[in-house]
Structures are given as C-alpha cells and as structure tokens.
Amino acid sequence: MKTRGLKRQFEGTVVSDKMDKTVIVAVERLVKHQEYKKYVRRTAKFAAHDEQNQCAVGDKVIITESRPLSRTKHWRVVNVVEKAV
C-alpha cells in the first residue's frame, strides 16, 4: 500500500478576506539570486479555505495543503497564529 508524504505547511499573512469561507494568504520566502548572490524576497499568494470565516486582513495564519476544494483553492487554514490589531 502506498503511503502519503507529509503535507506542506506555510505561515503567511492574510491579504484579502472578501470571499465567503476563503482568504488569500501571502507567503514570503527568501531566494538567493543566481547572478548577484544576494537574497531576494519572493511573495506567493494562496487561496485558502476558512470554514468559520475567522480570519481578518493582517492576521498571521498557518495553512496546509489539502485536496482541491475549487479551481484555485488547494489549501486550508490550520490556525490563526496572531490576530491583526
């Protein structure tokens, strides 16, 4: 029997909560530039499922991979690390 690997988890900031049960989470990472050898910030945005509509813009959240929930949603909000002020 085939076993599934670990699901990826990212920590990011909620940048949009205008949709019902969906938030957009911006995840920032550092990438080393090939030519200049300097670390550059890269931002990726993920649509994540928020079942209780508990997230607000500015919240720090942890998201994890899941099965496809819609055309763009493949992530779920696991928990809110820090609420926005």
From Swiss-Prot:
Natural source organism: Desulfosudis oleivorans (strain DSM 6200 / JCM 39069 / Hxd3)
A GO cellular component annotation in the UniProt record: cytosolic small ribosomal subunit
Quaternary organization: Part of the 30S ribosomal subunit.
Keyword terms, alphabetized: Ribonucleoprotein, Ribosomal protein, RNA-binding, rRNA-binding
SUPFAM superfamilies in UniProt: Nucleic acid-binding proteins
Pfam family, one: Ribosomal_S17
Protein function: One of the primary rRNA binding proteins, it binds specifically to the 5'-end of 16S ribosomal RNA.
Molecular function, one GO term: rRNA binding
Family: Belongs to the universal ribosomal protein uS17 family.
Cited InterPro entries: NA-bd_OB-fold, Ribosomal_uS17, Ribosomal_uS17_bact/chlr, Ribosomal_uS17_CS
Gene Ontology annotations of biological process type: translation
Annotated protein name in UniProt: Small ribosomal subunit protein uS17
Top-rank taxon, per record: Bacteria
Keyword Zinc-finger: no
Keyword Nuclease attached: no
